[in-house]
Amino acid sequence: MVLFTLEDFAVFKATTLATRMHLIREQLDPKFAEAATVIVPLLQTDQQAIYSHIAKHQRRYRNPPPNTWVAFSTSSRGYKMVPHLALGFWDDRLFLWLSVLRESKPASRVLTGITAMATTLPGKWQVAGEHTDKAMLPLTSANLATVGARFQTIKKAEFLLGKVYLADDPIWADPVRLWQDIQQRVVALKPMFDQLVQNV
């Protein structure tokens, strides 16, 4: 069973590239790999294979990565060019984002049907417009419209919808419950993931 814990955030206390990369490879990547064995079957269908991509950080030469993740997409070659699901860490949060990055453009109709589906999601969710920034907004009809409109009109804007688990969230006291919640949210996001894939 995959158990993400508060101890995982200690990876980001390492201040050098070599040390942080070593900790990511030793501590987080094995958990991402194990998580993938559960999440891939939740997303794939008989008609559509899903592939996992653990961040490699190959372009890092000096500064340590501020975050790390595993992404799930319909492409075996990568994930940035297509809608995907990303599960990962910053130094103060775990995130699960359904993402359409700028590399997926131009795809003017990519968000078709997503707004109506998103507003029916149970529980608390977040939206954001930039995957390299921690900034996020609670999922409301107004915030969803704002992020969606920005995505459609600004070249570098992105679209992210999902769940962020801040390090001070009480759910971290029960790693089993956290992992169950992640799986439930993957299932909840799957219809939108499928719609985005169809739209592109």
Curated annotation (Swiss-Prot):
InterPro entries, sorted: UPF0637 (IPR009403), UPF0637_domain_sf (IPR053707)
Pfam families: DUF1054 (PF06335)
Protein name per UniProt: UPF0637 protein LCABL_14170
Family to which the UniProt record says this protein belongs: Belongs to the UPF0637 family.
Organism encoding this protein: Lacticaseibacillus casei (strain BL23) (Lactobacillus casei)
